[in-house]
Amino acid sequence: MRVLVNNPRAQYDYYLLTGYCAGLVLKGSEVKSLALGQGSLKEAYVFIDKHEVYIKDFSISPYAFSGEFNHPFKRVKKLLLNRNEIKQITARQKQEGLSIIPLKVFFKNGKIKMEIWLAKPKKKFDKREAIKSKTIQRELRQQYGSP
């Protein structure tokens, strides 16, 4: 499994609860560009429309060698999930008010997959506590050596 793109802010902004592995419907130039690591999940979000799952604002840079047959920079892409998984996600999202967050894009058996998570947003004070605990742990490691 080779990770192509990560979402750096996901674990900082959200409590990650349940993860799913979804396939992506992509064009050829998008696949080649992602293989070079030219993608960003910073502003991307997942939504469900008519029992189908999509990702919006997942930016993939244009592939340099495709010329005029290049893909649009930010287009809505379809995610491939099992029908039962979509029902589970929809039910939990409606009941608990959770968000669907893309965490990473990776190669698995020659196919590009995306790891999505049901997540609960963190409050501002939760983020401060997380930063504080990380700095304390870092200082302890520096003082006493790594565990």
Curated annotation (Swiss-Prot):
Protein name: SsrA-binding protein
SS bond partners: none
Domain of life the protein comes from: Bacteria
Places the protein is found: Cytoplasm
UniProt similarity note: Belongs to the SmpB family.
Keyword annotations: Cytoplasm, RNA-binding
UniProt xrefs under Pfam families: SmpB
Function: Required for rescue of stalled ribosomes mediated by trans-translation. Binds to transfer-messenger RNA (tmRNA), required for stable association of tmRNA with ribosomes. tmRNA and SmpB together mimic tRNA shape, replacing the anticodon stem-loop with SmpB. tmRNA is encoded by the ssrA gene; the 2 termini fold to resemble tRNA(Ala) and it encodes a 'tag peptide', a short internal open reading frame. During trans-translation Ala-aminoacylated tmRNA acts like a tRNA, entering the A-site of stalled ribosomes, displacing the stalled mRNA.
GO cellular component, one term: cytosol
GO terms under biological process: trans-translation
GO molecular function: RNA binding
Transmembrane portions of the chain: none
Disrupted gene: phenotype observed: May not be essential, 1 disruption mutant has been isolated.
InterPro entries: SmpB, SsrA-bd_prot, SsrA-bd_prot_CS
